[in-house]
A protein has these predicted regions:
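Conserved N-terminal subdomain of the carbohydrate kinase-like
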Residues: 51-143, 327-338
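Conserved beta-alpha-beta core of the PfkB/ribokinase-like small-molecule kinase fold
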Residues: 138-226, 244-245
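Active-site metal-binding loops of divalent metal-dependent hydrolases
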Residues: 12, 37, 144, 173, ...
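Conserved phosphate-binding/catalytic region of the ribokinase-like
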Residues: 1-7, 160-164, 222-338
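Structural alpha-helical scaffold elements that stabilize or flank donor/cofactor-binding regions
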Residues: 131-132, 200-201, 230
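Well-ordered beta-strand positions
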Residues: 80, 206-207, 236
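Short, glycine/acidic-enriched loop or turn micro-motifs at the edges of active sites
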Residues: 14, 18, 60, 175, ...
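Glycine-rich phosphate/adenosyl-contacting loop at the front of the ribokinase-like
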Residues: 1-77, 104, 337-338
Length: 338
């Protein structure tokens, strides 16, 4: 197990998957899977062998109890995991097309007060922070906590305290309009207010990962050099694009890495989160500002292998790889890097 540790903060929820090509709110069979980007990353890191703490909130319900048990079984430090007695664990309706690609259709379970992940308590985080931050090297975060007033305060406190404690921050700029607007929206692009709220935290991060579409919406470019140049500290940037090549800039090294396409794609729900976990796992043992060009290529390719492996199973967490799985996949893969 690696000596350093990672903190993941944000949503833990249930992905309700409908049948391929079907409606998860009405068509059978449905499959309920543990999910939420930060929770996915935490579980993937732990399975690879990293020490991980998770900060989030689950409902006082069967889903919350089962998710808590899963995190404990994975060996994740749950000192920062809160239980909300007023709000349920969020259930996300995920529609998948015939190729396994997914989109979010809305939520189930709200009783009028929202969901547990929208109400992460700052008071409890302040109390529990010493238990989760010890020996931490990285804080991994998404942007969904910014969408709710209560969780946003807790989230921003963690970002600030991590920065002042010398903990590097990796941000997955995962724009999901349904989470911000609490309904299925026909307008995918973020509003000026939503965009500014997310961009305001970028000055504190060391690594930003985002999809090509998100890069275009927030920066009007998917070129990692242009993105990095527009950031306050010219941070490292990784731009994903589904099964298309990944463009990246790590420690001033530029590259384009090609996907490892699994023979059978069942579900892509957790591929991006497994990719993120792979990057952070490799970065625990090396300083970001000291990596060589070859190390940068290897780090990206390791993440790609993690993402590819997850696509072979249902859900974001259950199919996550062990370290041996990735070593074997990389030894067999002919995925190229340029």
């Amino acid at each position: 197990m690696l000596a350093g540790s990672v903190i993941a903060i944000g949503e833990a929820l249930i992905d309700r998957l409908g049948p391929l090509g079907g409606d998860p709110s009405s068509d059978l069979p449905i499959t309920d899977c543990f999910g939420g980007a930060p929770a996915n990353v935490a579980c993937a890191l732990s399975r690879l062998g990293a020490k991980v703490s998770f900060i989030g909130s689950l409902g006082n319900d069967a889903f919350g109890e089962d998710f808590n048990n899963l995190l404990i079984q994975r060996g994740i430090n749950t000192s920062g995991l809160q239980q909300d007695t007023l709000r349920p664990t969020r259930v996300v309706l995920v529609r998948r097309d015939s190729d396994g690609e997914r989109c979010f259709e809305g939520f189930e379970g709200d009783k009028g007060l929202g969901f547990a992940d929208q109400a992460i308590s700052l008071e409890q985080i302040i109390r529990d922070w010493p238990l989760v931050a010890e020996n931490a090297q990285w804080l991994v975060a998404g942007t969904i906590p910014l969408a709710s007033e209560i969780s946003s305060k807790a989230f921003l406190w963690c970002i600030e305290n991590a920065m002042h404690s010398g903990i590097k921050i990796a941000l997955d700029l995962n724009w999901r309009p349904t989470f911000w607007r609490n309904q299925v929206s026909t307008v995918s692009e973020p509003s000026v207010k939503e965009k500014n709220q997310i961009l305001s935290i970028l000055k504190n991060v060391s690594l930003i990962k985002l999809a090509k579409e998100e890069a275009q919406w927030f920066f009007h470019s998917s070129d990692p050099t242009e993105l990095s140049s527009s950031l306050p500290q010219r941070q490292s940037v990784v731009v994903t694009d589904g099964s298309n090549p990944i463009l990246w800039r790590l420690n001033n090294h530029l590259g384009k890495s090609f996907a490892i396409i699994p023979s059978s794609v069942v579900d892509t729900t957790g591929a991006g989160d497994a990719f993120t976990a792979g990057l952070i796992y490799k970065l625990i043992s090396v300083e970001l500002d000291q990596i060589s060009e070859q190390s940068a290529k290897d780090i990206i390719q390791f993440g790609i292998a993690c993402g590819s492996h997850v696509c072979k199973g249902v859900g974001a967490i259950e199919p996550q790889p062990y370290l041996d799985d990735i070593d074997n996949l990389l030894s067999l893969s002919k995925g190229g890097i340029s």
